[in-house]
Amino acid sequence: MGDFDMVLKFWGPVEADYSAHGGMVLTRLFTENPETQQLFPKFVGIAQSELAGNAAVSAHGATVLKKLGELLKAKGNHAAILQPLANSHATKHKIPIKNFKLIAEVIGKVMAEKAGLDTAGQQALRNIMATIIADIDATYKELGFS
């Protein structure tokens, strides 16, 4: 089984409740890596203790996971999906590439805990995310952003 199919096998619970899983991902990202919260102007004033259950955090987390779902379902044929995301994250949001690596690890942890992603699935997700992040980084370099 390929990496994409292995991860998609566990995607159902995430897809069934993007808001809850997205909220968990961003809350964990911000609590484990507090500096990342500063990259989201609308979340800067939210206390760490108030992140979980915050509707705006959950909504943005849902957006992140929906996009990841599109990327997973594209099974590597993702240039048309990824290009606009990479452009906006470089030129508008100014998100350093290392932050994609941080959120990728958090997504893996949340999927393991909440969707049953096993060890092989976690490695498959790491492989997929490494490719996606490398493609984002290539766009960043083309744009002169690093």
UniProtKB/Swiss-Prot annotation:
One Gene Ontology MF term: nitrite reductase activity
Keyword annotations of the record: Cytoplasm, Heme, Iron, Metal-binding, Muscle protein, Oxidoreductase, Oxygen transport, Transport
Domain annotation Globin: ranges: 2-141
Residues binding heme b, per UniProt: 89
Highest taxon above the source species: Eukaryota
GO biological process, one term: removal of superoxide radicals
GO cellular component: extracellular exosome; sarcoplasm
Subcellular location: Cytoplasm, Sarcoplasm
InterPro entries the UniProt entry points to: Globin, Globin-like_sf, Myoglobin
Family annotation (Pfam families): Globin
Leader sequence segment: none
Enzyme Commission no: 1.7.-.-, 1.11.1.-
Record-listed nitrite binding positions: 60
Catalytic reaction list: Fe(III)-heme b-[protein] + nitric oxide + H2O = Fe(II)-heme b-[protein] + nitrite + 2 H(+); H2O2 + AH2 = A + 2 H2O
Gene3D superfamilies, alphabetized: 6.10.140.2100, 6.10.140.2110
Binding site for O2: 60
Its job: Monomeric heme protein which primary function is to store oxygen and facilitate its diffusion within muscle tissues. Reversibly binds oxygen through a pentacoordinated heme iron and enables its timely and efficient release as needed during periods of heightened demand. Depending on the oxidative conditions of tissues and cells, and in addition to its ability to bind oxygen, it also has a nitrite reductase activity whereby it regulates the production of bioactive nitric oxide.
Subunit field text: Monomeric.
Family (UniProt): Belongs to the globin family.
Name of the protein in its database record: Myoglobin
Organism: Tetraodon nigroviridis (Spotted green pufferfish)
